[in-house]
Every structure is written in structure tokens, then in C-alpha cells.
Amino acid sequence: MSTIANDLIDFYYCGHSLSEYNGIIGDIGGGDAVGAVEIGNVLNLNPVELKSLKKRKSTAVTYDGYVEKQFSFFKNLCKGSDGFYTREEVSEIIRWLNQPNYEKFTPVYSDTTWPRVHYYATFNIQPITYMGNVIGFQLSMTTSAPFGYYDEVYLSGHGILVVDDTSEEQGFIYPVCSITASMNGHIVFKNSQKEEDVTIIANCKEGETITLNGEFGTIQTSMPHANLYNDFNYVFPKIWNHMDTSMGTNSFRNIFDVNLDGSLIEITYSPISKFGLI
């Protein structure tokens, strides 16, 4: 069981920060009167592998424990707190943190030079008690993948789009990719990294925007397209990052092009970070 170091001073989860709840990360030490008790659901997610490599999505929840990182937080006494959590405050924190799905978690460190990395995590919670009062919470965190993600990147271009992937993981990522047809016709979309992987959507209309999400295997259109699922060949665009063994150098440049001249290409993705939790 590993713990998070003292550099962590705050975090964001499900759109809220620990500081919003007047919390401060720390370690209170031992003593017979101090203990942790079970509360909420001890969540052990039943994950399935997604098409993006090494990433999981929960499909069911069972009640067992699995810990990747652990840390504790308490009330910030510098803000006039008596140090004890009321029953209502305990319930509010459980609702916030004890989620059955992997939600976005962003740590905040005292050293502002650390890069901002996001994870998708669930928490198991144990209130820490002293003389019958709740004084803090011990959190056990499980993430959806063995890596994190840097801030989301958005890129766009007409006809051609160059993506220099900054991921620290070799392999591929499924981006969210939108193509707006400049004219009626069949969209043929290629990546210079893997020219054999050709994405085709037939019978598109001028101004129609096709949005592809390979991670979840979805295709959407901005206009009525009666036979969309038959017109798509189900080859989702990928962003590649790998070692080119013939050249001995990193190969991270992806040049996307579409056959319909002037069509707008938009790509959104989050580069993979192996920075790790401090």
C-alpha cells in the first residue's frame, strides 16, 4: 500500500476541491483514542478494458477493497474550525467522494513547478475518530489506468492537420475527431502514421459534421443521415506515438488528411502522462 507524500496540499474531484470543504491534507499521528472506522461502500470496481490501451471502465461494483494510493485529510483549524465534523458534514463528504464510477481527480501540489496531471479515480473512505468524534478521513484511491493525463489539447485545420503527440506512453490514443465536409461526397480520412487504417464515411452532405469517438465506439452527425451506420467502415482515427526501430528515434508526428478539399478537421485528446502521483 503506497501513500501520497506531503507535497499534496489540495485536490479537485467531481468538480469540487477539498478546500471548498475546509479540508487540509495531513497526518494526525497515533494514540489509542485515534482510529479509522468503516463507512460508506468499500468499492471494488469490476473493470473492462476499453479500446484505448490499458484503460478501464467500470461495469459493476462489488464490495471489497483494492488500494493504489492512500492519504488523509482533516478540518483546517486556521479557518476557525473546532476540528470536528458534524453528521451532516460527514454525509456531504461521503456523497462527494464515494462515487461508483471513475471520476476526474486533479492533485494540487505545494511545488507549483509540478505539471498538472489528471486521473480518473474512485475513493474508499474511512472516517478518523477521536473520542467518538469524526476529525478526518482516510482515503484509499483507485485509478482507471496506470497513468494520468495532461490537459486536453484541441487542434483544427482545413484539409490537413498535423498532431505532434506529447504522450509519454508508446502506442495509440483514440481522440475525439470531427470532420465537417466541404462538399457532398464520401469522406476518406487517413493518418500518415498508419496509412492502411483508412476511415470512410459515405454519402456525406456539404456542411455535415461527423464526430468519431473511438474510445467509446460512437459516431454522430450534425445532419439527418439515414444510413450513417451502414455508410461508416468503423475504422476510428488514432493518434500514434512509438519508437521507429528503423530510424532509432521517436515517431510522434501524425499527419491527418481528408480527401474532400477544405474540409474542417478537429481533434481533441488528452496526452498520456507517466509523471505519477507524488
Question: What do these predicted regions represent?
Answer:
Residues 3-13, 103-107, 186-190, 219-221:
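Short polybasic amphipathic segments
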Residues 51-84, 133-147, 250:
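Oligomerization/assembly interface segments of phage tail-like spikes and tubes
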Residues 149-278:
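Intrinsically disordered, low-complexity segments enriched in serine, threonine, and glycine
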Residues 1-47:
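Polar/acidic, low-complexity leader/linker segments enriched in S/T/G and N/D
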Residues 65-110:
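Long, hydrophobic/aromatic-enriched structural stretches that serve as scaffold segments
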Residues 69-71, 119, 137-139, 175, ...:
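Hydrophobic residues positioned within well-ordered beta-strands of beta-sheet architectures
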Residues 18-29, 115-123, 197-204:
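Short amphipathic beta-strand/extended segments with alternating polar/hydrophobic composition
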Residues 99-147:
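Short beta-strand and beta-hairpin "edge-sheet" elements
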